[in-house]
Regions:
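Conserved serine/cysteine hydrolase catalytic core
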Residues: 140, 150-206
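Flexible "cap/lid" loop of the alpha/beta hydrolase fold
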Residues: 76-117
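Post-His helix in hydrolase/transferase enzymes
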Residues: 228-240
């Protein structure tokens, strides 16, 4: 739904399931996913075109690292509530990755409990609407999730992404952001949800300090998943950002 409300002059390209390509197996600090993103952009952008990288959470941070390494591919960067491990938190996460603690301080442990199969006659919209993660989603975004993340197989419907991979995404969250400090050369904006519990001030302030070219905007409402809670308004916010960048 968000994509449908972006300015029509933009052609949206996106990796179907980041970190699920066997050519780019998930690894620590998401280095292979950065390579996957760069390769995808190189292969899918038009000749002489540059790409506006727009990402949420995992995708936002991969977009940031990609833009730092290959600024020639991008004209702008819009990050929506990325998980920024800065300051003391990055040392905690570096240690936690070596222990089971990482399953407790990230959603990795909960992810492994995710239901993966439903009977084909079950009302999935009703099912997901009751879940904590989805309860504040725009109804159309729940439908978008169902149509993109679930496929029918015989009498049942199954998740079409790997929950172990999803858990490992959390387990390998980058703790090396200082290595990218000062490398961001493209116009960039960080948009955070007003009530986010992920990209919180204590984590984003050090990031903004080491990336002075990034402009921070606080979206007027919403939590970490605000792009799926208010897709139309977030699309308009992104459009406004791009208009200002292009002035």
């Amino acid at each position: 739904k968000l994509f449908n409300h972006l300015p029509k002059q933009y052609n949206v390209i996106a990796i179907d399931k980041l970190a699920h390509n066997p050519q780019y197996p998930l690894n620590d600090n998401w280095q292979n996913q950065v390579a996957e993103m760069i390769s995808f952009v190189e292969s899918n952008k038009g000749e002489h075109e540059k790409v506006v990288a727009v990402g949420h959470s995992f995708g936002a941070l991969v977009s940031y690292m990609s833009a730092c390494l290959r600024p020639d591919l991008f004209s702008a960067l819009v990050m929506l509530d990325p998980p920024l491990m800065t300051g003391l938190a990055r040392y905690l996460f570096r240690f936690a990755k070596k222990t089971r603690l990482i399953n407790k301080i990230t959603p990795a442990g909960i992810t492994l409990l995710r239901k993966q199969k439903w009977h084909r006659e079950q009302d999935l919209h009703a099912y997901f609407s009751k879940k904590v993660l989805f309860k504040d989603f725009d109804p159309d975004c729940i439908n978008d999730y169902i149509s993109s993340a679930i496929s029918e197989q015989g009498d049942h419907m199954h998740l079409n992404f790997d929950v172990e991979t999803e858990a490992n995404i959390f387990r390998t969250i980058p703790h090396n952001l200082p290595t990218y400090a000062g490398k961001l050369k493209v116009p960039s904006v960080l948009i955070t949800g007003k009530n986010t519990d992920v990209c919180v001030p204590v984590l984003r302030k050090p990031f903004l300090k080491t990336n002075p070219s990034v402009t921070h905007i606080e979206f007027k409402k919403g939590k970490h998943m605000f792009p799926l809670e208010y897709p139309v308004e977030v699309a308009h916010a992104i459009a406004n950002v791009l208009t200002n960048i292009n002035k």
